[in-house]
Amino acid sequence: RKTSGSSVDIDADLRNAILTDIKINAKSILKNVKGILVGGDIAFAGQKKEYDFAREFLKEMTEQLGIDEKNVYCVPGNHDVNQALIKKSDSILNAQSKIEEAKTIDEADHTFGKYITDEACPDLLYKPISEYNDFAVSYGCNIDQNRIVWTEEFSLDNNMKLKLLGMNSCIISSHRDHDGRDEQDARKMVIGQNQIPSYEENVVWVLI
């Protein structure tokens, strides 16, 4: 939340309850814990101080579970988007609109591809999540025009492998997500075909 870590923090009890639950229950019930998955909305408004606070909380969680901090895996959500930046940038808004207005997923992928290979500003669509990326890089979960998803591989029994894939569901997310819309008519996310992994024998994919 926006108030996390402030004098009016209303979620402190919830965070303490999570840590207590890990200490008393999770450590005795869960065996061989390999990591923590964070499915987006790490921040409230994509601001650095929010990520600093989140990093400290995740550090406490990893310490309780006895795992390394590098074993945190995260993806961005719409609250990880710096909407204040987008409001000031016609360039970002126009790029997002072009993708959203595509008639087919192939057209959306083509438009997205044009923007991330633009020699003048290939990171345009990733500027709104720059603070997320600064936070996520320490976990190996940063994404940009050169790496639009991240993957991590784990070995399982019987020659099987588990692969995590971190998706980006907020490519076109902005302050317009809920403009004049109710929950039934919320703005649709765009997840391109280039984020969908190909079939691999003896591999189980988990998309986050």
Regions found by a protein language model. Give the residues of each.
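Generic detection of long, well-ordered alpha-helical segments
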Residues: 48-51, 122-125, 186
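Structural beta-sheet core signal
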Residues: 38, 74, 206-208
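N-terminal active-site segment of His-dependent metallophosphoesterases
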Residues: 1-72, 82-86, 194-200
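His/acidic metal-ligating clusters that form di-metal
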Residues: 26-32, 146-208
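Active-site neighborhood of divalent metal-dependent phosphoester bond hydrolases
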Residues: 65-146
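A generic short-segment signal for beta-strand/edge and adjacent turn/coil regions
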Residues: 3-7, 40-45, 117-136, 176-178
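Active-site glycine-centered loops adjacent to acidic/histidine catalytic or metal-binding residues
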Residues: 40-41, 77, 167
